[in-house]
Amino acid sequence: MKALMQILKWTLITMLAFTSFNLFISPEYKVERSIEINVPTYIVYEQVSDLHQWENWAVWWKKDSLMITNYTGEERGLGAKMFWTSDVVGDGHLEIIECSSQGMKTKLAWGNGSWHFEETENGTNVSWSMNGKMPFLMSFMTMFIEDIVAPDFEKGLTGLKALCESIPAKTID
């Protein structure tokens, strides 16, 4: 009985410490990465606003070639939705909730995403971000989210750059 009381005591102390620790951590997070892509904005927009194209550049399909992806809603742009199932990267969904040639906003199961396209002298500056708020007992995860998400964003943007720069630009007469 004494051993059981010790286990209960240390379990309670651990739970209180963990809960107290979460009181001092912001539950809000934001991860953002940018890249310069040497093509006109419309080429980047066409690749990002068409969710079917993501498997050509986003890192998650490279991590799991068996990932199952389904698309509903619009073909591209506002209202386009993507659902995925994967033993490696998990299950989730994404929906484009705002869309224009300057960027778009997405809704995910665990946060919000946004894209910003800014024309530059040499092409397009592309920014990709995700933000959200963790549940109280998961607040500690905000300390690690940058390390978890940022490398995937960087690899995805690098893949997007390679893909977009391989597409010939249309000439306007």
Go through the PLM ranges and name each one.
Residues K107-K155, L160-A162, T171-D173:
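Beta-strand/loop substructures that line and gate deep hydrophobic ligand-binding cavities in soluble
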Residues K2-T19, L23-F24, L78, F83-N125, ...:
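Hydrophobic-ligand binding "helix-grip"
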Residues E36, E46, V88, I145-D152:
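Extracytoplasmic/periplasmic, Sec-exported soluble proteins
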Residues W57, L163-S166:
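Amphipathic, soluble alpha-helical interaction motifs
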Residues T41, L51-S101, M138:
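Extracytoplasmic/periplasmic/luminal assembly and interaction segments
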Residues E28, S34, S166-D173:
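N-terminal targeting or signal-anchor segments and their processing/structural boundaries
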Residues I43-W54, M82, I96, M104-T106, ...:
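Hydrophobic pocket/interface hotspot
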